[in-house]
Design a protein with these regions (language model features):
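Short, glycine/charged-enriched secondary-structure capping and boundary segments
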Residues: 4-5, 89, 171
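Solvent-exposed, charged interface segments at domain starts and junctions
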Residues: 1-3, 59-85, 202-208
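Short acidic/polar alpha-helix capping motifs at helix-coil junctions
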Residues: 37-38, 46-50, 94-95, 106-110, ...
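Short flexible/disordered coil segments
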Residues: 28-30, 54-65, 136-142, 156-163, ...
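C-terminal active-site "lid" helix and adjoining low-complexity regulatory extension at the edge
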Residues: 114-120, 138, 147-208
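Short hydrophobic/aromatic-rich motifs at helix boundaries and adjacent loops
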Residues: 43-46, 56-57, 99-103, 114-115
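Phosphate-binding core of ATP-grasp and ATP-grasp-like enzymes
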Residues: 17-25, 68-111, 127-141, 147-153, ...
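Active-site nucleotide/adenylate-binding loops and adjacent lid/helix of ATP-dependent enzymes
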Residues: 1-71, 123-126
């Protein structure tokens, strides 16, 4: 993800996208990001050491992954957001976190700075997430929201997966009626239950 400020920058990115492409793994960027986290918290020493090692010896999967080539996506930049809102929906249940923007950057992804308490969330995001999940018949999906100048929620990204440990501190979840259910939960278990339920339904249809 890059912030494009000029027409010439956009043309350069398009030329690369439809030319040699972009590597899936950028060791220089990984090293910079690991240093940023290490500077923020000394707990990142192991990650920093791994980044240095991978800068010198790129992991084997880099060759397998290849490059991102043949496409380029652009969207309007929405300024003045100190965080984004990540809402995950699985089988009629939603949970989320706020990801604060990195210092000196515009991106929230990878910042490592989160908020989980219910009062931090605009429940319009939750409602929109449920609505779209139902319309598109999605099983597990993550939505990233920001807010425009009129304080209207906008979806900037949709993902099919998420890093599970980052959501362990979530204090509860919503159901489609926006009722809040306080307490620990197991989203991975929800996925298993959903697959079993859908497989059973498909089996029953075939039997009839």
């Amino acid at each position: 993800v890059k912030l494009v400020r000029t027409r010439s920058e956009a043309k350069s990115l398009v030329t690369t996208a439809f030319g040699k492409g972009f590597p899936n793994y950028d060791p220089t960027n990984r090293l910079k990001e690991s240093w940023r986290k290490f500077s923020f918290s000394r707990d990142g020493f192991v990650d920093m050491a791994k980044a240095i090692a991978r800068y010198v010896y790129p992991p084997n999967y880099v060759k397998i992954m290849g490059k991102e080539v043949g496409y380029a996506y652009f969207q309007n930049f929405i300024p003045n957001n100190e965080s984004d809102t990540r809402i995950i929906v699985i089988d009629g249940k939603a949970f989320g976190l706020l990801r604060y923007v990195r210092k000196g950057d515009f991106r929230a992804s990878g910042s490592g700075s989160f908020a989980y308490e219910r009062e931090h969330f605009d429940e319009r995001c939750v409602s929109i997430a449920f609505e779209i999940t139902e319309k598109l018949s999605m099983q597990c999906v993550a939505f990233d929201f920001v807010f425009d100048a009129a304080n209207q929620p906008l979806i900037v990204e949709i993902s099919y997966g998420f890093s599970a440990p980052g959501y362990d501190p979530c204090p509860g979840y919503w159901t489609p009626d926006l009722e809040w259910h306080e307490g620990p939960f197991n989203p991975q278990g929800w996925m298993v239950d959903l697959v079993i339920k859908q497989t059973t339904n498909d089996s029953n249809l075939h039997n009839h």
